[in-house]
């Protein structure tokens, strides 16, 4: 006999992140991972450098300073906030703590690829609801709720489509999710969706709604891996019992606290993203490349078929530009393009114009 993994584990395909290198190119333009093209707040960088002088000290285990900062900025109860190693850790802990063999984890067909992995890792059964026009379909999700449903993961705005649904639609879903299930609103890109509170108001309205956020996108701290969740005190208490006591480093905590407090930097990044997103979408449309209105920091460019998408990707690589192939998300005919700075957007559109043979 040999030791074997739990059922479902070997059904998990390894996660493939956005490419970072092009053979023969020293510094490609990386638009494959939805990173902040402006980097992170200078205040965060300075705080990280300062904190690095005390690396022999253990970090805070309750993350109180960061939770207080998040609560103050967003008007939330800091006691109902938990911090994790990216929002990924918290999404994983939710599956670990609330789902298991015989349970179902529900998500949409083009949702974050890790949702299936979270379900299988917990021994639960993944259940997929179809989308409508690349957008979350509330009715399709409701139709697939069963007594076995324990978690419903919704990315809003969605990755890789950039589409989003409003609070009223989410409220209707929350009203339909039974009290024995958790509705998890994955808000990795929530800040880019103007007028959306990430679901905070729904968390306050319903006992079984959880929202998550990350510092990896808008705040430009992907290298530090910091995320947070907001839920009822009861759910937070459960998650705190299964997370590691020193899950976040002192450097990560300090950098995230400085970043969330630098509102001027945040507002500048949001304004720049909104402006360049409009430019990118408009430029793609002028080239005859379809794309849905995006509410995130990326645009899903849809080509005629998979062959054209792969050819476009190869052409962009030849010009030193990295974007994301999203066949694994069910879009073989599409490329996901991170919204960059003004000159980045110009470079992408010019390269695609040459690919299309447009002068």
From Swiss-Prot:
Among the GO molecular function terms of this UniProt record, one is:
histidinol-phosphate transaminase activity
Give start-end ranges for the coiled-coil region(s). none
Residues annotated as transmembrane:
none
Does Transferase show up as a keyword for this record? yes
Q: Which UniProt keywords apply?
A: Amino-acid biosynthesis, Aminotransferase, Histidine biosynthesis, Pyridoxal phosphate, Transferase
What Enzyme Commission number(s) apply to this enzyme?
Answer: 2.6.1.9
Task: Give the first-level EC class, as a single word.
Answer: transferase
Q: Which residues carry this modification: N6-(pyridoxal phosphate)lysine?
A: 217
Q: List required co-factors.
A: pyridoxal 5'-phosphate
Q: Which InterPro entries match?
A: Aminotransferase_I/II_large, HisP_aminotrans, HistidinolP_aminotransfase, PyrdxlP-dep_Trfase, PyrdxlP-dep_Trfase_major, PyrdxlP-dep_Trfase_small
The GO annotation for biological process reads: L-histidine biosynthetic process
According to its UniProt record, in which pathway does this protein act? Amino-acid biosynthesis; L-histidine biosynthesis; L-histidine from 5-phospho-alpha-D-ribose 1-diphosphate: step 7/9
User: Catalysed reaction(s)?
Assistant: L-histidinol phosphate + 2-oxoglutarate = 3-(imidazol-4-yl)-2-oxopropyl phosphate + L-glutamate
Family note: Belongs to the class-II pyridoxal-phosphate-dependent aminotransferase family. Histidinol-phosphate aminotransferase subfamily.
Assembly and interactions? Homodimer.
HAMAP family in alphabetical order = HisC_aminotrans_2 (MF_01023)
Name of this protein: Histidinol-phosphate aminotransferase
């Amino acid at each position: 006999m040999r030791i074997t993994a739990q059922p479902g584990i070997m059904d998990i395909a390894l996660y493939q992140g956005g490419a970072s290198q092009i053979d023969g190119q020293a510094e490609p333009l990386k638009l494959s991972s939805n990173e902040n093209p402006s980097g992170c707040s200078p205040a965060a960088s300075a705080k990280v450098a300062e904190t690095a002088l005390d690396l022999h000290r253990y970090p805070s285990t309750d993350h109180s300073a960061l939770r207080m900062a998040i609560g103050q900025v967003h008007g939330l109860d800091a006691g109902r906030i938990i911090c994790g190693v990216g929002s990924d850790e918290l999404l994983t802990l939710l599956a670990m703590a609330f789902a298991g063999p015989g349970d179902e984890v529900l998500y949409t067909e083009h949702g974050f690829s890790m949702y299936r992995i979270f379900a299988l890792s917990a021994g639960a059964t993944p259940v997929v609801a179809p989308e409508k026009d690349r957008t979350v379909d509330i009715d399709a999700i409701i139709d697939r709720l069963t007594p076995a449903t324990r978690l419903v993961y919704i990315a809003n705005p969605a990755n890789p489509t950039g589409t989003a649904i409003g609070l009223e639609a989410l409220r209707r879903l929350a009203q339909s999710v039974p009290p024995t299930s958790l509705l998890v609103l994955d808000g990795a890109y929530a800040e880019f969706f103007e007028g959306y509170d990430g679901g905070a108001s729904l968390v306050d309205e319903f006992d079984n709604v959880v929202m998550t956020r990350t510092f990896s996108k808008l705040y430009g701290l992907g290298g530090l891996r910091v995320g947070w969740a907001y839920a009822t005190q009861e759910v937070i208490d459960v998650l705190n019992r299964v997370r590691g006591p020193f899950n976040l480093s002192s450097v990560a905590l300090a950098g995230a606290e400085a970043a969330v407090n630098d509102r001027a930097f945040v507002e500048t990044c949001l304004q720049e993203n909104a402006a360049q997103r409009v430019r990118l979408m408009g430029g793609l449309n002028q080239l005859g490349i379809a794309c849905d209105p995006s509410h995130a920091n990326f645009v899903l460019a849809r080509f005629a078929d998979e062959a054209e998408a792969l050819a476009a990707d190869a052409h962009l690589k030849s010009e030193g530009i990295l974007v994301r192939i999203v066949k694994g998300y069910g879009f073989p005919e599409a490329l996901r393009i991170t919204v960059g700075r003004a000159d980045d957007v110009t470079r992408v559109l010019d390269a695609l114009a040459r690919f299309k043979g447009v002068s």
